[in-house]
Amino acid sequence: MTDASHPTAADDLGALSTLFRSEQGGHERVLLCQDRESGLKAVIALHSTALGPALGGTRFHAYASDEEAVLDALNLARGMSYKNALAGLPHGGGKAVIIGSPAPVSEGGLKSEALLRAYGRFVASLDGRYVTACDVGTYVADMDVVARECRWTTGRSPENGGAGDSSVLTAFGVFQGMRASAQALWGEPTLRGRTVGVAGVGKVGHHLVDHLVEDGARVVVTDVRPESVERVRARHPRVVAVPDTESLIRADLDVYAPCALGGALNDDTVPALTARVVCGAANNQLAHPGVEKDLAGRGILYAPDYVVNAGGVIQVADELLGFDFDRAKAKAAQIFDTTLAIFDRARTDGVPPAVAADRIAEQRMAEARTV
């Protein structure tokens, strides 16, 4: 279903409607949103509500075209369906994108209280079928503003009834996936004595380094922001820094952890990898279909990104229950068992782990539809 969501917006949103009809790919609903007064133009995509209300963040980005924005919303919503299913959450998958610069109006961007509140009203119009949260370009303070118009908002500040920053549990979940990978490959659920390369030590990556150092791993890092590397090395002086990702993937690693941009595993990086395991926090690590087969062909064990980085969505889902950190952490700890189950399914089916993960998620969604 497609909605033209503002009575004066039909001409501006007509192209987006055409794009949606041609690209919808099984999505249940897409809401095309426009508020001319605030400058809001957004897409809310609901991929599946088989397991419950769709849950996924709001991305605020200056897309090169409306087509790119629509496709991103559709792809991200689908990914959230799979992530939520494998995390064992009572939620389907959805995602929203706000089109434009996420900088404040005072800095030449589009972000303003009026725009965020207008967006919140569109989310509210879905009457609980979509629950939103932070994503790229949106932050806890933004969710506080959205929540003034919409009670189906997570990722809020603790002062406003939320759980705050989810990077701590995201990193914890990635660490559990890494422990499971070590168990599957080396027979022990520890990184002690292993060399782990972390690409990106920002919000999630620096917490992951904390876990690795505590576990006894040797850690090598890189980041495009020197200050992020300096912060990590100030906390952990034995951490080694290299100048760029290319240097990192060619280093003598046991585990490679992409924790920055998507597309980290591609036709250039996979042949250069020395690591036996890839397990990181970045979204959409596989640059295109088929990369997972290239990894398997080289004997590299890949822990699917949307499985191991689910700690963040586990946190925001728990926020709907009245956030309890210990309860959410216990749920995120289950990423260890889920990752092992995926590796077992991959061996049984003779497929790469990414394919096995998809099959398990699809099975859970299909079973929910028949109940």
Swiss-Prot record:
Keywords: Branched-chain amino acid catabolism, Cytoplasm, NAD, Oxidoreductase
Entry-linked InterPro entries: Aminoacid_DH-like_N_sf (IPR046346), Glu/Leu/Phe/Val/Trp_DH (IPR006095), Glu/Leu/Phe/Val/Trp_DH_C (IPR006096), Glu/Leu/Phe/Val/Trp_DH_dimer (IPR006097), Glu/Leu/Phe/Val_DH_AS (IPR033524), Glu/Phe/Leu/Val/Trp_DH_bac/arc (IPR016211), NAD(P)-bd_dom_sf (IPR036291)
Reactions accelerated catalytically: L-valine + NAD(+) + H2O = 3-methyl-2-oxobutanoate + NH4(+) + NADH + H(+)
Native species: Streptomyces fradiae (Streptomyces roseoflavus)
Annotated protein name in UniProt: Valine dehydrogenase
Lineage: Bacteria, Bacillati, Actinomycetota, Actinomycetes, Kitasatosporales
GO BP, sorted A to Z: valine catabolic process
Localisation: Cytoplasm
Molecular function in Gene Ontology: valine dehydrogenase (NAD+) activity
Family: Belongs to the Glu/Leu/Phe/Val dehydrogenases family.
SUPFAM superfamilies, per the entry: Aminoacid dehydrogenase-like, N-terminal domain (SSF53223), NAD(P)-binding Rossmann-fold domains (SSF51735)
Binding site for NAD(+): 200-206
Pfam families in alphabetical order: ELFV_dehydrog (PF00208), ELFV_dehydrog_N (PF02812)
SMART domains hit by this protein: ELFV_dehydrog
Matching CDD domains: NAD_bind_Leu_Phe_Val_DH
Keyword flag Cytoplasm: yes
Quaternary structure and interacting proteins, as annotated: Homodimer.
Active site residues of this protein: 95
Gene Ontology terms: cellular component: cytoplasm
